Amino acid sequence: MSCNILYLCGGYYNYDEGYTPEFKGKDNFQGQIIHPQKWPEDLDYLDKKVVVIGSGATAVTIIPAMAEKVSHITMLQRSPTYYMAPPDRMWLDEFLKKYTTDKIGYFLVRWKNILLGRFFVSQIKKKPLKYKEMLINGVKEHLGDNYDIDKHFTPKYMPWDQRLCLVPNGDIFEAINSGFMKLSFVLYNISLLSCVS
């Protein structure tokens, strides 16, 4: 066999049926259990107490989007995640978009992102303690002294031992700082689901 491009798509994602762990007590739980991949368009969460399980990209996208309507929202996390809050638009991307064709601009931006990503990962692997401090300080810059950064935003592992979570424009931090967001962080291991009013 020969080819110019070979895709090896052996990932663990299943977009038809996303992974849902088996929770003891699920059948007796009186609330709703919603998987983000099966989000009902008519989901009513106005003034409800919501728990989002996880601390990755989906959680940091869902939480700010729901925060204004819920009575309280809790991020239940097994372990904190490293967050990085880059701008969603970079000046170089905008420059290339303005002064090149779409095809050339896309090609250049794509390669810039690939090379920058590879460089960043290689640097983190060479100096993990330096970048751990940098990432944690980035969260501190967004949240100030309002949160227990060590408990809720400092993983026990080194950066890139697990995936880093990008939070474009730091919107979850903005939501937390707004004071409008009724958010709790809880470290957990779920043993039983129950409904407590």
Language model segments and positions:
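A conserved short coil-to-beta-strand element within the FAD-binding core of flavoproteins
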Residues: D42, H152-K156, L164, G179-V196
